[in-house]
């Protein structure tokens, strides 16, 4: 028995001249049903609410205004669930709607509640259908077409594998739709490879278009938690059917050999940093090579405004992110402490190692 998280993006659910959105969902549902009947557990993370809402209102263009986007999402979400409910119930399955926001997963208690609820639904043999709560999300629908959400959900339920379906057949060194010499990438083994790909994406190279950058970020989150990530072609439902039966397709992102525990993964990925601490070389070395806590003496600059025990980024002198953690002092207290530390021998702990996660840990 395997525990799968399957993510279906907006581009695949728009429909085309060959298939309507309802027919696309019907095809995916047949694959998911077969997996459930084999005894697997499956969580579906799906986009598509805004598009269906636009269709219902007769809008030819996706709204730009945030309130209009939230309104179309509210209209479309009911239609989206109705399509999945109809397709799965015809095959004898029950579905459950789970709507999440970044603030839900950023609260440790609500994260644990979401995890427990999803696991209970899976124990009952139910198919949880997860989407961002676009109608209420204060982050202006910026989760990244649910890529990041799917990785956080996979971590929360401790999935074996995350399947991200997209409109290309695998990862390439550059966009194959505009570069005929783009090279296919079948395997990504190490966080350093992910880092190189993310840099290339930022420069318009690998995954620089079509929302691929967010898929790289999602792969980093999931693989750091010990989850295998499969990026594959979602235009052909038979690809999904094969993946759910263990056949290989697309690009495989292999899990980190020393995965983060659930709490550390939450610290590293579910929280949105509210500030940044720039460290000196000595502090960077202590964190990276000695497993130390961050002491006040190692903090050179403080950016942003935050309260005590809120998340911050830790960067090296070159400005590269080294780690994330919960700062024991508020930004105001920390700035004052930095100014006065020359007159005292005390160097209190700013981020304890128990609530600190290295970027490539």
Swiss-Prot record:
GO terms for cellular component: cytosol. It catalyses: L-glutamate + ATP = L-glutamyl 5-phosphate + ADP. Pfam families: AA_kinase, PUA. The keyword Nucleotide-binding applies. One of its GO terms (molecular function) is glutamate 5-kinase activity. Keywords: Amino-acid biosynthesis, ATP-binding, Cytoplasm, Kinase, Nucleotide-binding, Proline biosynthesis, Transferase. The keyword Nucleotide-binding applies. ATP binds at residues 7, 166-167, 209-215. SMART domains: PUA. Pathway: Amino-acid biosynthesis; L-proline biosynthesis; L-glutamate 5-semialdehyde from L-glutamate: step 1/2. Residues 274-345 form the PUA domain. It comes from the Bacteria. PROSITE patterns: GLUTAMATE_5_KINASE, PUA. Its EC number is 2.7.2.11. It is an enzyme of class 2 (transferase). One of its GO terms (biological process) is L-proline biosynthetic process. Catalyzes the transfer of a phosphate group to glutamate to form L-glutamate 5-phosphate. Belongs to the glutamate 5-kinase family. NCBIfam families: proB. HAMAP family: ProB. This is Glutamate 5-kinase. It comes from Prochlorococcus marinus (strain MIT 9313). The lineage of its organism: Bacteria, Bacillati, Cyanobacteriota, Cyanophyceae, Synechococcales. The gene is proB.
């Amino acid at each position: 028995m395997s525990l799968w998280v399957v993510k279906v993006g907006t581009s695949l659910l728009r429909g085309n001249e060959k298939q309507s959105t309802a027919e696309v969902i019907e095809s995916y549902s047949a694959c998911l049903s077969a997996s459930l009947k084999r005894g697997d557990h499956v969580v579906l993370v799906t986009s598509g609410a805004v598009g269906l809402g636009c269709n219902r209102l007769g809008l030819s263009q996706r709204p730009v205004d945030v309130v209009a986007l939230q309104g179309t999402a509210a209209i479309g979400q009911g239609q989206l669930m109705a399509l999945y409910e109809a397709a799965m119930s015809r095959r004898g399955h029950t579905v459950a709607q789970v709507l999440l926001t970044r603030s839900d997963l950023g609260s440790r208690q609500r994260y644990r509640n979401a995890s427990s609820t999803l696991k209970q639904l899976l124990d009952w043999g139910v198919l949880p259908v997860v989407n961002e709560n676009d109608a209420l999300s204060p982050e202006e629908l910026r989760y990244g077409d649910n890529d990041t959400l799917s990785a956080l959900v996979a971590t929360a339920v401790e999935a074996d594998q995350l399947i991200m379906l997209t409109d290309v057949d695998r990862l390439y060194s550059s966009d194959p739709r505009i570069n005929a010499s783009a090279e296919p990438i079948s395997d990504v083994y190490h966080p350093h490879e992910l880092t190189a790909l993310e840099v290339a994406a930022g420069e318009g190279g690998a995954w620089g278009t079509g929302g691929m950058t967010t898929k790289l970020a999602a792969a980093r989150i999931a693989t750091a938690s010990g989850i295998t990530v499969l990026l594959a072609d979602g235009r052909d439902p038979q690809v999904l059917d094969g993946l759910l039966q263990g056949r290989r397709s697309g690009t495989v992102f292999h899990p980190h050999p020393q995965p983060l525990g659930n709490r550390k993964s939450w610290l590293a990925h579910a929280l949105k940093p509210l500030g940044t601490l720039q460290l000196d070389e000595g502090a960077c070395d202590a964190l990276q090579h000695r497993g130390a806590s961050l002491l006040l003496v190692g903090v050179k600059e403080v950016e942003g405004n935050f309260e005590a025990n809120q998340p911050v980024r830790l960067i090296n002198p070159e400005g590269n992110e080294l780690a994330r953690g919960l700062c024991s002092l508020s930004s105001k207290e920390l700035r004052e402490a930095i100014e006065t530390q020359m007159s005292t021998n005390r160097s209190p702990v700013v981020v304890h190692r128990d609530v600190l996660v290295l970027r490539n840990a």
